[in-house]
Each structure stands twice: as C-alpha cells, then as structure tokens.
Amino acid sequence: MPNIELLEKSMPVAPIRIAALAGCRELAEEVDKKLVKFRKELVAAKKSTIIPQGYAEKSFLVDCECPRFGTGEGKGYIKESVRGTDLYIMVDVTNYSLTYSVCGHENHMSPDDHYQDLKRIISAATGKAHRINVIMPFLYEGRQHRRTKRESLDCALALRELSAMGVSNIITFDAHDPRVQNSIPLKGFDNFFPTYQFLKALVKNVPDFKLDNDHLMIISPDEGAMSRAVYFSNILGVDMGMFYKRRDYSTIVNGKNPIVAHEFLGDDVHGKTVIIIDDMISSGESMLDVTRQLKDRGAERVFVCTTFGLFTEGLDKFDEYYEKGYLDRLITTNLTYLPPQLHDKPYFIEADMSKFLALI
C-alpha cells in the first residue's frame, strides 16, 4: 500500500488518462491496475466526500492504435475523447517483437518506428488534452547524446521535436546521460532510477544476501556507470570499485573503437558478493567479461543489476557464463520488452516497476 498521506496532499491537474502504444501495453495494464487500486484506497481513506471528477475510475487506459497502410505508412488513432485530460502516453522504443506489413513483406518495428508512432498519437491529442506527458522508460537515442565526430545529435533533436509538438513533461528511467535535458530547459524532464527495486528483488530472491561492508561490494563496469555505482554504494554504506576500458583507437569495428581490456581499480573482492550496476545490457559482451574477471579475482558471487536488458545478441552467452559459474544472478526491470525465454532462465530476476510508475 502506498503512502496515503503523500497521495492525499497531491491535487490532480486534470483527469488522468493513459494512452499506451502497442509495444508498451502489457506494462501499462499493470500500471493501470495499481493506479486504480491506489485511488480506490485513497477515496476510502478520505473523510471528505468531495472527490475530483475522474479521480476514481475502473480504468484509466485510453483505446488507441497506430494502423498501417499497405505501403507501411501509419497513422495515429485515439478512439475516445481525451479533451481536458492529463494524458500520459507510454512507449517502449526497444520492443522489436512487433511487426507490420510493407507491400506484403513482414517488417519488425525499430526504435524509429516506435518514435514515429509516438508522434502520431501526440499529434492526434494535441489541442485537445489539457496536458500531454510522455513516459518513455528507455530514452529514444539516449546513447547518441553528444557529438564527438561529424555526427547527428539525435537525442537532443528528438527531445526538441517532442517539446515543439506540445509535450509538457518527459518521464524516463536511468538516462544514459541525463544532461541531454539541457536541450529542453523550459520543459519537464524527470529521470528516475530503479535502485530500490533492485534491492527489493535481491532481498526477496536471495535469502542469504548480506548488506554490509564485509560481504558486499558495488562495481562499476566502466567510467560511464560511476555515478550509479557511487550512489548505490553510498546508500548501502559499502565499498565500490570500477573497471575502465582500454580501447584501440587506431581501428573501428561496428562503428566503435574495440575494447582491448578491462582494467580494475578498487579493493580486494576475494570472498565477497559483488553487484555490477549499469543502465543497460546491449550485447552483454563487456559486462560478461567483467563478471569473469571478478570471479577470477576471487569474488564469491556476482550479481548484475541493469535497468534495461536489451540482449541484442541473444542469451546464449549468458547461459554459457552461468554454467561456467561466472554469473550468479541477473536482475533487470520490466520497463522494456524482454524475450519470453528469459523468464525461464535460472539466473534471471525481474524487478517490477509497475507500482513505481503508478505512484509517479
């Protein structure tokens, strides 16, 4: 049960409605169930009989879709009125499981396709909804947040575009670099972290998990994850260490300078449980290399906590490292699409974020 007192003090801007794009519908339904439950409890706990219109509903979900023409072109369609509402549009730009037909050929939806559908729904609601908010757990083009060569600034461009379309607030999780919000200084940009949900999942699923400096250590897999590891270690009061990547800057492979080695900086990990924390697992190669090195250094158990499990190269390598004893647990959230077979893996733990989203 949420903190009723905090919810009671908040006054809604307008009646809430949730428009979930197809790739995020499952998560949105869970959020809707919890939001309905929270508000029913709040109404029951209130002594006052004055309840704002639209505050307690059987569901806050709005029926919407983005159908396609035979050529693959799409359109946004909201099937019920959202006039005067506080509209939250939920989108998962990483959900590659959805497909659509292009001239008879099946095409998997890319992040670009999801982003275009988001703009279509915004366009359908602009000028009608009282306020438009976008919940985009994985920030579109979040890894293209800066320019180091002759390249585009896709994330900043997307944020500016959404702002220009009338979006008041953008809600995301564990942005690769939250400083990208500087591109829209006059709009709301909320960046949340699933730290509590990681701890909750670990304590619930690992019975002998010990939260003290003698048994636990937090590890940053690279320089970019340092702020996350520092925060995690500070709230737990334990030591932290980090790896940094040595790259070969003379060559480029798949658009990146290849990693030559991971070098470790930190105290002895021998006999300790270590938690590696980062914002995402893409292919997972560098993360798995870090787990191997930590086990080689004598770590008793290695847990990986990552907000987004993308698994772009599949799960075979993770299975291999689990069987070899390099990886003990992998904790990731349900904020983005997860392959169904992942739920059957003995090392996988899901950190449920639906309650947190409902409270937001």
Map each language-model feature to its residues:
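PRPP-associated nucleotide enzymes
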Residues: 1-360
